[in-house]
């Protein structure tokens, strides 16, 4: 049975996703609830697939509210490993497709990391348009370089820079502007970012770091952490254009890895477009190793503009 997601489903959905995902992304009960608080213009809808009282699948569909191009939809879902091949994913996608039609999405983006998911999307009219390298590091097994702070700069945990949140937002959006993507991420207000990113339950204010020039944030390494399951995800690493090529991103990201190692985190995941050589090289220097190539897929008459 397919039904609408309810907030009380969050713990079971988080457990489902941790088991269904082949790569250890950060997914907590609080995150699942937080994802439902997208801006109203996203017109988000979420479903679960039930087998008796057990949740065996989950999917969402919405408009990409953070891009200025209109009528761009976004979908993704997962099915418990032991339940695959029974039509659960297809049933969820039927609900997704009906919602996409109701919100008049002209183009739809999704992604998949492994061949079964990629075949599922292709069979439903999607085509691969970009690829990302998913990489991982066990922070306990690496000794990242780059901890010498250049003169005039200061490294602090995010918690100690929250009074400069609007300036951190400017650094974040500079990173978004330069990161290759299917659709340009250019339609986020500070208030939306404050709720969606800074307010994310897993964004660790001790494990994320900010580089200050004087008192001005100029580089960031944001880290999402699941302390219970000892896993972490790099949310954003970025530097203002005028301060690049000084090792500041490496400084901040290395600090987050050292912090994660001290916490006992066993895996830090990151994703980078394969046409982003600078960030790929930085991650290689810090000890990240490739896990899988994620395909980014689009369904629609013309693809991204």
Predicted regions and their residues:
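Acyl-donor-binding surface of acyltransferase catalytic domains
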Residues: 65-67, 81-160, 294-299
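Polar/charged side chains located within well-ordered beta-strands of beta-rich proteins
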Residues: 17, 93-94, 110, 172, ...
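Short loop/turn motifs at secondary-structure junctions and domain boundaries
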Residues: 37-41, 199-204
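Active-site/acyl-donor-binding loops of N-acyltransferases
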Residues: 124-143, 207, 258, 263-305
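Conserved donor-binding loop and adjoining core beta-sheet/short helix segment
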Residues: 7-8, 17-109, 113, 213, ...
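Conserved acetyl-CoA-binding loop-helix of GNAT-fold acetyltransferases
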Residues: 85-98, 239, 245-258, 277, ...
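Extended hydrophobic/aromatic segments used for targeting, binding, or gating
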Residues: 223-224, 231-234, 245, 249-255, ...
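Short amphipathic alpha-helix that is part of the acyltransferase structural core
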Residues: 1-35, 148-188, 192
């Amino acid at each position: 049975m397919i039904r609408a997601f309810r907030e009380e489903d969050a713990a079971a959905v988080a457990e489902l996703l941790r088991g269904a995902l082949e790569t250890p992304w950060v997914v907590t009960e609080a995150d699942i609830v937080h994802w439902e608080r997208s801006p109203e213009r996203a017109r988000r809808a979420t479903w679960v697939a039930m087998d008796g009282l057990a949740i065996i699948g989950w999917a969402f569909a919405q408009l990409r509210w953070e891009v200025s191009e209109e009528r761009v939809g976004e979908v993704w879902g997962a099915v418990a490993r032991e339940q695959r091949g029974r039509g659960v994913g297809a049933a969820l996608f039927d609900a997704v497709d009906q919602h996409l039609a109701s919100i008049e999405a002209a183009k739809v983006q999704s992604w998949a990391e492994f061949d079964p998911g990629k075949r599922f999307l292709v069979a439903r009219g999607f085509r691969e348009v970009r690829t990302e390298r998913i990489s991982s590091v066990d922070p306990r097994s690496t000794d990242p370089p780059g901890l010498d702070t250049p003169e005039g700069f200061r490294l602090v945990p995010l918690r100690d820079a929250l009074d400069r949140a609007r300036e951190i937002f400017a650094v974040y959006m500079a990173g978004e502007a330069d990161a290759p993507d299917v659709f340009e991420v250019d339609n986020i207000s500070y208030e939306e970012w404050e709720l969606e990113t800074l307010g994310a339950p897993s964004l660790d204010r001790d494990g994320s770091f900010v580089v200050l020039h004087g008192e001005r944030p100029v580089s960031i390494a944001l880290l999402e952490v699941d302390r219970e399951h000892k896993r972490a995800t790099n949310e954003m690493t970025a530097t203002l254009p005028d301060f690049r090529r000084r090792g500041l991103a490496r400084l901040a990201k290395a600090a987050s890895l050292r912090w994660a190692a001290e916490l006992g985190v066993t895996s830090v995941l990151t994703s980078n477009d394969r046409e982003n050589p600078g960030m790929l090289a930085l991650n290689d220097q810090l000890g990240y190793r490739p896990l899988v190539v994620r395909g980014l897929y689009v369904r629609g008459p013309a693809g991204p503009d």
